[in-house]
Protein backbone atom coordinates (compact mmCIF):
# COMPACT_ATOMS: atom_id res chain seq x y z
CA UNK A 1 0.00 0.00 0.00
CA UNK A 2 1.30 3.44 -0.88
CA UNK A 3 0.37 6.68 0.88
CA UNK A 4 0.36 9.52 -1.60
CA UNK A 5 0.56 12.61 0.59
CA UNK A 6 2.20 13.78 3.77
CA UNK A 7 -1.23 14.39 5.30
CA UNK A 8 -2.08 10.72 4.82
CA UNK A 9 1.18 9.68 6.46
CA UNK A 10 0.59 12.00 9.42
CA UNK A 11 -2.90 10.61 9.90
CA UNK A 12 -1.67 7.02 9.74
CA UNK A 13 1.09 7.72 12.25
CA UNK A 14 -1.15 9.76 14.59
CA UNK A 15 -4.69 8.41 14.67
CA UNK A 16 -7.28 10.72 16.21
CA UNK A 17 -7.51 10.62 19.97
CA UNK A 18 -10.87 9.74 21.52
CA UNK A 19 -12.85 12.56 23.09
CA UNK A 20 -12.03 12.99 26.75
CA UNK A 21 -14.92 13.01 29.20
CA UNK A 22 -14.31 16.71 29.83
CA UNK A 23 -14.33 17.54 26.10
CA UNK A 24 -17.49 15.49 25.55
CA UNK A 25 -19.24 17.22 28.47
CA UNK A 26 -18.34 20.63 27.03
CA UNK A 27 -19.47 19.71 23.51
CA UNK A 28 -22.63 18.02 24.79
CA UNK A 29 -23.67 21.07 26.83
CA UNK A 30 -23.20 23.36 23.82
CA UNK A 31 -25.03 20.95 21.50
CA UNK A 32 -27.97 20.56 23.88
CA UNK A 33 -28.23 24.35 24.16
CA UNK A 34 -28.25 24.67 20.35
CA UNK A 35 -30.95 22.00 20.17
CA UNK A 36 -33.08 23.85 22.74
CA UNK A 37 -32.75 27.03 20.69
CA UNK A 38 -33.66 25.28 17.43
CA UNK A 39 -36.65 23.57 19.07
CA UNK A 40 -37.87 26.94 20.38
CA UNK A 41 -37.43 28.44 16.91
CA UNK A 42 -39.57 25.61 15.48
CA UNK A 43 -42.04 25.90 18.39
CA UNK A 44 -41.66 22.26 19.43
CA UNK A 45 -40.89 20.56 22.71
CA UNK A 46 -39.45 17.16 23.50
CA UNK A 47 -36.21 15.46 24.49
CA UNK A 48 -32.69 15.94 23.11
CA UNK A 49 -29.95 13.29 23.39
CA UNK A 50 -26.29 13.58 22.37
CA UNK A 51 -23.85 10.67 22.50
CA UNK A 52 -20.26 9.82 21.65
CA UNK A 53 -19.14 6.26 20.91
CA UNK A 54 -15.43 5.53 20.60
CA UNK A 55 -14.17 3.17 17.89
CA UNK A 56 -15.35 1.77 14.57
CA UNK A 57 -18.35 -0.03 16.08
CA UNK A 58 -20.67 1.16 18.81
CA UNK A 59 -19.85 -1.02 21.80
CA UNK A 60 -20.46 1.65 24.43
CA UNK A 61 -21.10 5.38 24.60
CA UNK A 62 -21.26 8.45 26.77
CA UNK A 63 -24.47 10.44 26.52
CA UNK A 64 -26.24 13.50 27.86
CA UNK A 65 -29.87 14.42 27.53
CA UNK A 66 -32.09 17.40 28.18
CA UNK A 67 -35.83 17.73 28.47
CA UNK A 68 -36.89 20.55 26.17
CA UNK A 69 -40.33 21.31 27.58
CA UNK A 70 -41.81 17.81 27.94
CA UNK A 71 -40.47 14.37 28.85
CA UNK A 72 -43.69 12.75 27.69
CA UNK A 73 -46.48 13.62 25.29
CA UNK A 74 -49.66 12.33 26.94
CA UNK A 75 -51.93 13.41 24.07
CA UNK A 76 -49.98 11.85 21.19
CA UNK A 77 -51.70 8.47 21.39
CA UNK A 78 -54.08 6.51 23.59
CA UNK A 79 -51.23 5.52 25.92
CA UNK A 80 -49.07 8.64 25.39
CA UNK A 81 -45.47 8.85 24.20
CA UNK A 82 -42.28 8.65 26.25
CA UNK A 83 -40.19 11.11 24.26
CA UNK A 84 -36.98 10.11 26.04
CA UNK A 85 -37.61 6.49 25.08
CA UNK A 86 -38.20 7.48 21.46
CA UNK A 87 -35.04 9.63 21.31
CA UNK A 88 -32.97 6.76 22.72
CA UNK A 89 -34.63 4.32 20.29
CA UNK A 90 -33.49 6.58 17.44
CA UNK A 91 -29.98 6.59 18.94
CA UNK A 92 -30.04 2.81 19.32
CA UNK A 93 -31.05 2.36 15.69
CA UNK A 94 -28.15 4.58 14.59
CA UNK A 95 -25.74 2.60 16.80
CA UNK A 96 -26.79 -0.58 14.99
CA UNK A 97 -26.97 0.74 11.42
CA UNK A 98 -24.34 3.51 11.56
CA UNK A 99 -26.78 5.64 9.54
CA UNK A 100 -29.15 8.47 10.43
CA UNK A 101 -32.32 7.13 12.03
CA UNK A 102 -35.04 6.10 9.62
CA UNK A 103 -32.69 5.99 6.62
CA UNK A 104 -31.08 2.55 6.78
CA UNK A 105 -33.39 0.96 4.20
CA UNK A 106 -33.88 -2.06 6.47
CA UNK A 107 -36.87 -2.99 8.59
CA UNK A 108 -36.62 -1.72 12.17
CA UNK A 109 -35.82 -4.32 14.80
CA UNK A 110 -37.91 -4.74 17.94
CA UNK A 111 -37.14 -1.69 20.07
CA UNK A 112 -36.65 0.54 17.03
CA UNK A 113 -39.26 2.61 15.22
CA UNK A 114 -37.48 3.49 11.97
CA UNK A 115 -38.45 7.13 12.51
CA UNK A 116 -36.29 9.98 11.31
CA UNK A 117 -35.04 12.52 13.81
CA UNK A 118 -31.55 11.30 14.64
CA UNK A 119 -28.31 12.16 12.85
CA UNK A 120 -24.76 10.92 13.24
CA UNK A 121 -21.22 11.69 12.15
CA UNK A 122 -18.08 9.53 11.96
CA UNK A 123 -15.15 11.30 13.61
CA UNK A 124 -11.54 10.19 13.46
CA UNK A 125 -12.02 8.34 16.75
CA UNK A 126 -15.65 7.24 16.83
CA UNK A 127 -19.21 8.46 16.27
CA UNK A 128 -21.29 11.44 17.32
CA UNK A 129 -24.94 10.39 17.65
CA UNK A 130 -27.61 13.07 18.12
CA UNK A 131 -31.38 12.59 18.39
CA UNK A 132 -34.49 14.60 19.20
CA UNK A 133 -38.07 13.48 19.72
CA UNK A 134 -41.12 15.66 20.15
CA UNK A 135 -41.97 17.22 16.80
CA UNK A 136 -42.64 15.98 13.30
CA UNK A 137 -39.77 13.88 11.94
CA UNK A 138 -38.50 16.66 9.67
CA UNK A 139 -38.44 19.09 12.62
CA UNK A 140 -36.70 16.53 14.84
CA UNK A 141 -34.03 16.18 12.15
CA UNK A 142 -33.48 19.95 12.06
CA UNK A 143 -33.09 20.08 15.85
CA UNK A 144 -30.66 17.15 15.78
CA UNK A 145 -28.62 18.70 12.98
CA UNK A 146 -28.28 21.91 15.02
CA UNK A 147 -26.74 19.91 17.86
CA UNK A 148 -24.52 17.84 15.59
CA UNK A 149 -23.08 20.92 13.86
CA UNK A 150 -22.05 22.40 17.21
CA UNK A 151 -20.35 19.14 18.19
CA UNK A 152 -18.55 18.84 14.84
CA UNK A 153 -17.23 22.41 15.06
CA UNK A 154 -15.88 21.72 18.54
CA UNK A 155 -13.83 18.67 17.54
Located regions from the model:
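Flexible, solvent-exposed loop/hinge segments and secondary-structure transition points
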Residues: 2-122, 126-155
Amino acid sequence: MSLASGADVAWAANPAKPLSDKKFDTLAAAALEAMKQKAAELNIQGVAVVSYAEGDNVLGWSSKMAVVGHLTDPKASASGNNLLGIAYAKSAEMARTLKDSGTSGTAPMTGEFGWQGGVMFKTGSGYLIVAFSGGKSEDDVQVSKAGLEVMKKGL
